[in-house]
């Protein structure tokens, strides 16, 4: 590239020297000069801008026209995310806007400020023009979608719906038909499946008051539209040669096989026949295919784990065209998604749709025969009654008896066929069940053996166990997954209880709270009518020594986890909604943040609050109870200056939403939590999904973040311990400041156990402050230069510290380090932001509760008259466990689960959707992510039409 020519092009485009620009473009066309027409400037006056951006901004129409004719990219982005259309619209240059639109400028591109060209302009006429063009472009896309649905072009439908700004999937034509109508009446099954997955509404009607179901042809299509399910009568194996892309080796030819929802690839066809030397495979659950319109052979498959695999159909392969591959992948993806992603807890759903359809047809035939038999018996009895009157009816009588006999025989045959089908189906299912049970038995024994050997190997490499932690994690409230699940969480009740017997030690009483904190566990402050908060539970916890964890967890392999009933002994007497409320234990940090005028100091307090939210999990081995759908919890703390309401808004996946507000109208704190779980054999990892938002009303600021990932180690053998790791990014949406905290993984010798480090940065990524500490104990702030110097010096001494750490670990292999003031080295010049409060003396006997947690389930007669009947405090199983009545708690827990299951079945039969009471789903006003927003009116105390969940 000729850098000098590019600089000249940028200069002349900026200054409007049309003749000079034309000369350069002609020289480039003749290949006399090699330069990029879309080059970006590097000097201060044109940094990151292309010649077209500059010409549009400064209003040089002739230059713009010449550049576009020469092939300049009309939708090129500068470093601020602006297209040339943004710049022309911003400066109010109507003629240039029209010219750019003639060259198909995209009006939907959003720049770095979150604005489209329409939103960037101050000119009313330009805004109206862009709105009209947007409508036209959108309608063109809708017409393309309708046409593709009519013709069954699944790849085109997928490409249109995968655009950054896709057409409305529920758009309609002149007759009111949506794309789903069009695909349904033409019997394009793959298109229907794709549209349904993309949010097409099967209940919409056209102008003739017809739904897609009314226009559908065939039982299979109708079944898909009725239940939004897929009938898999005979999922065919599909195979053939495909080129597959690789990051390091480029394109390579494989023999690719699609079977039972799994995509596998082999070096050659004979390997696929014998299922040997498989080079790789991918389950197609929730897989999405995308294509490039410019290449008729290329397509890619995005799998459920966000990995993308590129394929190319060989040009000489006529039998396996790209369209056939796409249809086959869509079909196998639908199969895999249906059987892997459906709610398996709904007992009224048939597991095998195809067998159920066969049985239905067989029963229908039997019913027809039975009705005929009833009619013949009726006529036969009538003839018998008339037999005394007419003696000459004997021949007719005998003939009728023959007909009756034949009808009986046909009925018996039909019922026998039906019985045979039932018998065959039962035999096949029993055989498959025995096979799966044997597989699970072998796999679980092998897993236990491998885990034991691995544990012993680790102990031989490191003379002693690494430092362990037995913290309980909020997000782990009812699950393990065979691979990865966002569904019902029921199985992890056993997980966090495993180490209780090994670590029943109270927290170090040497810890102290910083002066700004307030006592959560005592005092005379009023809270829902309670004058003095309790400092103990009615009954201490029971011993868990007699319960085997692995004997329960091994049942999780290959099974739906929500079906496994866990002993209530592994619980603690709190609902998960109450555990969420423990975020508010250190509310004083929010009040302190509001009192500061410096945004950096406010961010420090918010970061400390985010870290302190998980601190209560230290040594909390009990698992909170699963909230029932519609369950609520409220807490009013006048002494801490807040009130909170939470609700279980979804059961599959389990989502808990909460909303807290300051009593002095100084803050709002809200969010929704649900975990994404992965089972790795020896450990379980939970990635907490959901956005947490804090609004400081006095400063008109909003902060958002997500919690770190939590991992439970040694669930099979060895000491159970939990660590939290991953980055937590706290964003100030007003100033653009960010705080990036790194929750560090433990490491080989436990050097980084529980450590948290990070920086506060402004929007230009300049470091303003460094933060460090442990999430189990404290957090400090220090100047970033001082912190970097300390880290650099610490790195030099790493080997010496490792040796020292290894020696100390070998002496105390089974001990968990208790956090104290010396476990975090305080860098000179540091300021303490937060320190954890000491726990009450009886904490070890009270489920290792903090003083704050001790009062969460407290209730009296006055409070019972105020709170709604859905409040956690009124749950009989939690109340029984708190009172030490374990047997009653277990019975009540089972009763409530069965009641919830029955209510779900009744709603399914009546086609009634569950409606949340205090929250509604919508985008987070600051991050844009899907969230649950408080609807208001809870504190009006008008609790009518509440569900009966207890």
From Swiss-Prot:
Region named Disordered: 795-821, 881-913
Location of the PH domain: 235-334
Basic and acidic residues bias locations: 890-901
Q: Which Pfam families match?
A: Ank_2, Oxysterol_BP
Q: Which GO terms describe its biological process?
A: lipid transport
Where is the signal peptide, in residue numbers? none
| Sequence ranges of the ANK repeats | 47-76, 80-109, 175-204
Q: Which residues form a coiled coil?
A: 430-463, 877-913
Keyword field: ANK repeat, Coiled coil, Endosome, Lipid transport, Lipid-binding, Repeat, Transport
Task: Tell whether Kinase is among the UniProt keywords.
Answer: no
Which tissues is this chain's protein expressed in?
Detected in prostate and liver.
Q: Where is this motif: FFAT?
A: 469-483
Q: Provide a Gene Ontology MF annotation, just one.
A: cholesterol binding
Question: How does it associate, per the subunit comment?
Answer: Interacts (via FFAT motif) with VAPA. Interacts (via FFAT motif) with VAPB. Interacts with the GTP-bound form of RAB7A. Interacts with OAS1B. Interacts (via FFAT motif) with MOSPD2 (via MSP domain).
* Function in brief: Binds phospholipids; exhibits strong binding to phosphatidic acid and weak binding to phosphatidylinositol 3-phosphate. Stabilizes GTP-bound RAB7A on late endosomes/lysosomes and alters functional properties of late endocytic compartments via its interaction with RAB7A. Binds 25-hydroxycholesterol and cholesterol.
**How does the record comment on the protein's domains?**
The FFAT motif is required for interaction with MOSPD2, VAPA and VAPB.
- In which family does this protein belong, per the annotation? Belongs to the OSBP family.
Q: What is this protein called?
A: Oxysterol-binding protein-related protein 1
Q: Which organism is it from?
A: Rattus norvegicus (Rat)
Q: What is the lineage of its organism?
A: Eukaryota, Metazoa, Chordata, Craniata, Vertebrata
């Amino acid at each position: 590239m000729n850098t000098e020519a590019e600089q000249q092009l940028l200069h002349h485009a900026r200054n409007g020297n049309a003749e000079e620009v034309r000369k350069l473009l002609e020289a480039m066309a003749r290949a006399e000069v090699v330069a990029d027409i879309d080059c970006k400037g590097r000097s201060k006056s044109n940094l990151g801008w292309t010649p077209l951006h500059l010409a549009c901004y400064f209003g040089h129409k002739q230059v713009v026209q010449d550049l576009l004719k020469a092939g300049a990219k009309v939708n090129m982005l500068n470093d601020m995310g602006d297209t040339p259309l943004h710049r022309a619209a911003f400066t109010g240059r109507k003629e240039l806007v029209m010219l750019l639109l003639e060259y198909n400028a995209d009006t939907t591109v959003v720049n770095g400020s979150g604005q489209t060209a329409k939103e960037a302009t101050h000119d009313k006429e330009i805004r109206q023009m862009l709105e009209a063009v947007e409508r036209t472009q959108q309608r063109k896309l809708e017409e393309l979608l309708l046409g593709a649905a009519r013709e069954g072009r699944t790849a085109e439908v997928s490409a249109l719906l995968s655009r950054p700004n896709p057409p409305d999937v529920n758009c309609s034509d002149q007759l009111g038909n949506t794309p789903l109508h069009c695909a349904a009446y033409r019997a394009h099954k793959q298109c229907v499946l794709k549209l349904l997955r993309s949010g097409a509404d099967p209940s919409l009607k056209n102008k003739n008051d017809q739904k897609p179901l009314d226009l559908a042809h065939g039982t299979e299509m109708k079944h898909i539209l009725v239940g939004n399910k897929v009938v898999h009568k005979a999922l065919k194996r599909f195979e053939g040669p495909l080129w597959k892309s690789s990051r390091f080796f480029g394109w390579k030819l494989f023999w690719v096989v699609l079977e039972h929802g799994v995509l596998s690839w082999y070096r050659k066809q004979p390997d696929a026949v014998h299922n040997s030397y498989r080079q790789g495979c991918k389950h197609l659950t929730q897989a999405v295919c995308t294509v490039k319109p410019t290449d008729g052979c290329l397509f890619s498959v995005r799998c459920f784990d966000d990995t993308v695999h590129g394929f190319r159909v060989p040009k000489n392969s006529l039998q396996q065209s790209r369209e056939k591959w796409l249809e086959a992948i869509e079909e196998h993806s639908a199969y895999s998604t249906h059987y892997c992603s459906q709610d398996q807890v709904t007992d009224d759903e048939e597991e095998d749709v195809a067998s159920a359809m066969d049985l239905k047809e067989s029963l229908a035939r039997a019913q027809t025969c039975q009705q005929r038999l009833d009619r013949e018996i009726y006529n036969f009895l009538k003839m018998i009654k008339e037999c005394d009157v007419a003696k000459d009816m004997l021949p007719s009588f005998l003939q009728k008896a023959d007909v009756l006999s034949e009808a009986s025989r046909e009925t018996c045959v039909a019922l026998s066929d039906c019985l045979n089908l039932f018998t065959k189906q039962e035999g096949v299912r029993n055989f498959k069940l025995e096979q799966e049970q044997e597989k699970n038995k072998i796999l679980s024994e092998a897993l236990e053996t491998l885990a034991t050997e691995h544990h012993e190997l680790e102990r031989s490499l490191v003379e002693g166990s690494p430092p362990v932690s037995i913290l309980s994690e909020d997000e782990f409230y009812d699950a393990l997954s065979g691979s990865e699940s966002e569904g019902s969480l029921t199985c992890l009740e056993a997980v966090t209880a495993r180490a209780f017997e090994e670590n029943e030690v109270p927290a170090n009483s040497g810890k102290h709270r910083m002066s700004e904190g307030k006592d959560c566990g005592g005092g005379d402050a009023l809270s829902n009518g309670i004058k003095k908060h309790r400092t103990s539970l009615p009954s201490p916890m029971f011993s868990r020594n007699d319960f085997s964890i692995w004997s329960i967890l091994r049942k999780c392999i290959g099974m739906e986890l929500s079906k496994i009933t866990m002993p209530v002994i592994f619980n603690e007497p709190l609902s998960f909604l109450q555990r969420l409320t423990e975020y508010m234990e250190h509310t004083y940090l929010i009040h302190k943040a509001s009192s500061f005028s410096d945004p950096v100091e406010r961010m420090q307090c918010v970061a400390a609050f985010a870290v302190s939210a998980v601190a209560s999990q230290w040594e909390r081995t009990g698992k909170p109870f699963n909230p029932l759908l519609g369950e609520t919890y409220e807490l009013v703390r006048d002494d801490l200056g807040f009130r909170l309401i939470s609700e279980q808004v979804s059961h599959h996946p389990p989502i808990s939403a909460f909303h807290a507000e300051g009593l002095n109208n100084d803050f709002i704190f809200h969010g929704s939590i649900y975990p994404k779980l992965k089972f790795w054999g020896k450990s379980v990892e939970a990635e907490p999904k959901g956005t947490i938002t804090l609004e400081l009303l006095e400063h008109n600021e909003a902060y958002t973040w997500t919690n770190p990932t939590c991992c439970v180690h040694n669930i099979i053998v060895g000491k159970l311990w939990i660590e939290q790791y991953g980055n937590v990014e706290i964003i100030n949406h007003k100033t653009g400041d960010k705080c990036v905290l790194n929750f560090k993984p433990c490491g080989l010798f436990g050097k980084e156990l529980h450590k948290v480090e990070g920086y506060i940065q402004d929007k230009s990524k300049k470091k303003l402050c460094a933060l460090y500490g442990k999430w189990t104990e404290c957090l400090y702030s220090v100047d970033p230069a001082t912190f970097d110097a300390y880290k650099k010096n610490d790195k030099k001494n790493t080997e010496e510290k490792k040796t020292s750490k290894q020696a100390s670990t070998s002496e105390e292999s089974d001990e968990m380090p208790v956090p104290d003031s010396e476990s975090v080295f305080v860098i000179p010049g540091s300021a303490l932001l937060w320190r954890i409060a000491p726990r009450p003396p009886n904490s070890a006997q009270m489920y290792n509760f903090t003083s704050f947690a001790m009062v969460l389930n407290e209730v009296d007669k006055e409070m019972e008259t105020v709170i709604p009947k859905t409040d956690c405090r009124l749950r009989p199983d939690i109340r029984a466990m708190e009172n030490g009545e374990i047997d009653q708690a277990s019975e009540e827990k089972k009763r409530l689960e069965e009641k919830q299951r029955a209510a779900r079945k009744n709603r399914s039969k009546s086609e009634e959707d569950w409606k949340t009471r205090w929250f509604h789903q919508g985008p987070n006003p600051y991050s844009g992510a899907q969230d649950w927003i408080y609807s208001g009116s809870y504190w009006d105390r008008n609790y009518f039409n509440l569900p009966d969940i207890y």
